[in-house]
Amino acid sequence: VGHVEVTKLRHQLPDGRVLFADVSFRVADGAKVALVGPNGAGKTTLVRMIAGDLVPKSGTVTTSGGLGVMRQFIGSVRDDSTVRDLLLGVAPPRVQQAAAALDAAELAMMEHDDDEPTQMRYAQALADWGDTGGYDAEVLWDTCTVAALGVPYERAQYRGLRTLSGGEQKRLALEALLRGPDEVLLLDEPDNYLDVPGKLWLENELRESVKTVLFISHDRELLSRAATRIVTIEDGRSWVHGGSFATYHEARNERNERLEELRRRWDEEHAKLKALVLRLKIKATYNDGMASQYHAAQTRLRRFEEAGPPEETPRDQKVRMRLQGGRTGVRAVTVDNLELTGLMRPFSVEIFFGERVGVLGSNGSGKSHFLRLLAGGEVAHTGRWKLGARVVPGHFAQTHEHPEMVGRSLVELLWAEHSLQRHDAMRALARYELQFCGDQPFETLSGGQQARFQILLLELAGSTALLLDEPTDNLDLASAEALEEGLAGYQGTVVAVTHDRWLARSLDRFLIFGADGSVYETPEPVWDEGRVVRER
């Protein structure tokens, strides 16, 4: 099949900080290995090194077999990318190159169709497309679009990605990779944005696949059901748990206890050696015969210190979110006979101050459009909706594409958005474990760090109604728990689109976007609604 082997990898950030050092592990043929760790620990950077996007400062990466990669932020909502572009993005390089040559030849034909050299180049591009497996890829893509979107590739290929939900884009890429020819897959947060049926599908596909898979995830259910081994990156180092996620936390606690004991013993021995050197130094001042013992003790102490202490026990994150909110009118959101054009049938609902309402349903059913409409975005609709008195919406978008933040550091953004001086900005960032990222451009942060920063902006904005679209998808476990605690103390209204079964337990009631195009309310979460059947 294929394998991945990483040996003593090291990566240093532009500011000189070491992101990780001495990272070593092996993903054997057919293994399903999860890569876990806090947001910003370097998981995505490590995957990019294995994929060949980055060159390590030191260490080696060895792989065998074809390598398929799904990056953390796949697809797009802000440009004219199409379904074909997304599928080409996860295709083997030879297919990508042949497609680029064919596109160029077709464009030349449109401009100079009577030119014989142009016609010859077009004929050669068609032949190369077939020789590199392009037609086989199109057969595969047809299967993928039918499975993910319910339509054949011929109808779907030029459809804009902005018309697909984040979950539909993810499912499409996963279908192509899991069905494709590559023997080794690198999947960065593959479960993000998938609805619950999609997550269950992914869990089963990973278990059944013969491919070698290294995947990053914070989803406790996926880790429990699909991973056979766990590689952890924390505090710049790696360690491997050879069992499943069911025994991971116990193994991590035992490891930390061992590290603490080793450090205690090292400190005791260090103190003894320093005391010995001091005693012998005093004796050697009035007894020349003790000089050799004194120098021997000095050498022993120096070698002990050069060998260094054992590995530090990893520090647990302490993310502290202070979501305030504020009193609003009793009816925070009123929806009257609202129809999201081309998505769902008309529905009416009232959401009252202080409620926590979950918005559930399959990928592509219109949930994100609904939140975007409430946030003031341009969404085609009929019917009426309004926000109550003193309702200030704060929108957490599902995708992290923020062109207005690109090239600007977190400190700059906090000054521009909320007039925070550097000292106050760094204090706010420290509560979100982002203090070391203050001078980094927003786009260089990990997905989880970007999510935390967006939540900080909501906190500082004083929003009285939070419109959260998949808020926990990129968050590590500590950050997700901090968000749940923050929402519990929030004095305002929360409307959350989520497929997180843990987060849903803290919500009061649910608005379900059904497979038949209807929208209905339930007191308990409903996870088994299928894809909405509509003309595409």
Regions found by a protein language model. Name each.
Residues D142-L149, L276-R279, A297-A307:
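Short amphipathic coiled-coil heptad-repeat segments
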Residues A98-M109, A125, W266, H270-L280, ...:
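Non-transmembrane amphipathic alpha-helical segments
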Residues A137, R303-R315:
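Proline-centered turn/helix-capping motifs that create local helix->coil transitions or kinks
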Residues A21-A28, M290-Q293, R315:
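Short low-complexity stretches enriched in small and charged residues
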Residues L259-L280, A284-T299, K318, R531-R536:
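ABC ATPase nucleotide-binding domains
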Residues V1-E261, M321, G325-R536:
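ABC ATP-binding cassette signature C-motif
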